[in-house]
Amino acid sequence: MGAVLGVFSLASWVPCLCSGASCLLCSCCPISKNSTVTRLIYAFILFLGTIVSCIMMTEGIQTQLKKIPGFCEGGFQIKMVDTKAEKDCDVLVGFKAVYRINFAVAIFFFAFFLLMLKVKTSKDPRAAVHNGFWFFKIAAIIGIMIGSFYIPGGSFTEVWFVAGMLGASFFIIIQLVLLVDMAHSWNELWVNRMEEGNPRLWYAALLSFTSLFYILSIVFAALLYVFYTKPDDCTENKVFISLNLIFCVAVSIVSILPKVQEHQPRSGLLQSSIITLYTLYLTWSAMTNEPERSCNPSLMSIITHLTSPTVSPANSTTLAPAYAPPSQSGHFMNLDDIWGLIIFVFCLIYSSFRTSSNSQVNKLTLSGSDSVILGDTTNGANDEEDGQPRRAVDNEKEGVQYSYSFFHLMLCCASLYIMMTITSWYSPDAKFQKVSSKWLAVWFKMGSSWLCLLLYLWTLVAPLVLTGRDFS
């Protein structure tokens, strides 16, 4: 009897698979809005794609993929550096799988980007497709994934690698904008609370976190100088670290200039400290992609040097061993790639909960003027009977709270960023005989760090330059 009731209880949720997003989650968070829950579900779909991509790099999955006719032989035949020929297929099956998984996810979100252009309110019939029909969407993604494994190699992987570089570059720009927006919003929130009451507490909190981020930045920069430079070598690394340190000091000074404070009172050192730390991360990430291993020590050698008291500074040249061949299970992510995914997940969650009222960077992903927060009071959220799937309030009848099309474009580019991150930005050579790090990835990431600083600097000086525009 209990099993029968369980089946009927499960069946009551089936309509949710073909209806709105809020129906799927609102039993655990009844006071929510449709715009927020929909973004969370799309973000969760992308997160699942990321997990599947990571799983595809494991040995067991690769063994099964090798059984697919033509997947390992023919097409994109390349060899990993310092890897024996009999292990080539084990490594590249994982790389091919990551390309195809994220191809399916990117195509799915790009199709929705085109479909959702010019959607203004939830009354648009296309809004129902955006906010519902989850069974068919998931089935479509799975179908595209399965079909992508039968796409011939060769030119497909070559073209998709270029597409991945372009898409990942655009997502890094979006990620940088979200980071700047988060820093501004955090500072504004705490400054407001400091003005409302108990100023000493919030001032101490602001000072503590600002000091912490700057201390971490100083330690980070010192470690980069110690392990990624040499007295008579690694000139590029010295220039990269020094330039970005100078730029970070410059934007920190600009953020507290009287003129900037006059036009933008909420600007301060908290934002600058976050941007400084992130810029140094991008600098480190760029240097880990350098093909010259003498200036790019492995993580294990650095840890050994830090933990072993027997290693002297005179032996610091041992920190740059030859490139370690990947295991039989294939190449997996480096530490900087893992940190890149962590930052990606954070930005993805932030973009899902992000409110339009606290956006400081031109409301990049939002178009409405109302706040989209889970804690808002809603009417009719509990109208459903107990035990039935609760539905969230449709807060977009008068206007969408974010750009549907841009949100899908962001997720499309995010899937390409995941693809490049998991494969460590490896680039095939002209004859497709090996795959290795390239200076292109180094300059790409360094350019991203400079773009981050430029974006933040623009948010500081924009009110001074565009005096006729309201930045409040």
From Swiss-Prot:
Keywords associated with the record: Antiviral defense, Cell membrane, Glycoprotein, Golgi apparatus, Immunity, Innate immunity, Membrane, Phosphoprotein, Transmembrane, Transmembrane helix
Tissue expression as described in the entry: Highly expressed in the neuronal populations such as Purkinje cells in the cerebellum, brainstem and spinal motor neurons, locus coeruleus and raphe nuclei. Highly expressed also in thymus, kidney liver and testis.
Glycan attachment sites: 34
Modified residues (Phosphoserine): 371
Record field: catalytic activity: a 1,2-diacyl-sn-glycero-3-phospho-L-serine(in) = a 1,2-diacyl-sn-glycero-3-phospho-L-serine(out); a 1,2-diacyl-sn-glycero-3-phosphocholine(in) = a 1,2-diacyl-sn-glycero-3-phosphocholine(out); a 1,2-diacyl-sn-glycero-3-phosphoethanolamine(in) = a 1,2-diacyl-sn-glycero-3-phosphoethanolamine(out)
TM segment ranges: 97-117, 133-153, 159-179, 207-227, 239-259, 330-350, 406-426, 446-466
PTM characteristics: N-glycosylated.
InterPro entries the record matches: TDE1/TMS
GO biological process, one term: positive regulation of endoplasmic reticulum stress-induced intrinsic apoptotic signaling pathway
Cell location: Cell membrane; Golgi apparatus membrane
Molecular function as annotated in GO: phospholipid scramblase activity
Topology class, membrane: Multi-pass membrane protein
Residue ranges that the UniProt entry lists as topological domain Extracellular: 1-96, 154-158, 228-238, 351-405, 467-472
Pfam families xref list: Serinc
GO cellular component: Golgi apparatus; Golgi membrane; plasma membrane
Residues on Cytoplasmic side: 118-132, 180-206, 260-329, 427-445
Family statement: Belongs to the TDE1 family.
Function: Restriction factor required to restrict infectivity of gammaretroviruses: acts by inhibiting an early step of viral infection. Impairs the penetration of the viral particle into the cytoplasm. Non-ATP-dependent, non-specific lipid transporter for phosphatidylserine, phosphatidylcholine, and phosphatidylethanolamine. Functions as a scramblase that flips lipids in both directions across the membrane. Phospholipid scrambling results in gammaretroviral surface exposure of phosphatidylserine and loss of membrane asymmetry, which leads to loss of infectivity.
Protein name as it appears in the record: Serine incorporator 3
Source species: Mus musculus
Gene: Serinc3
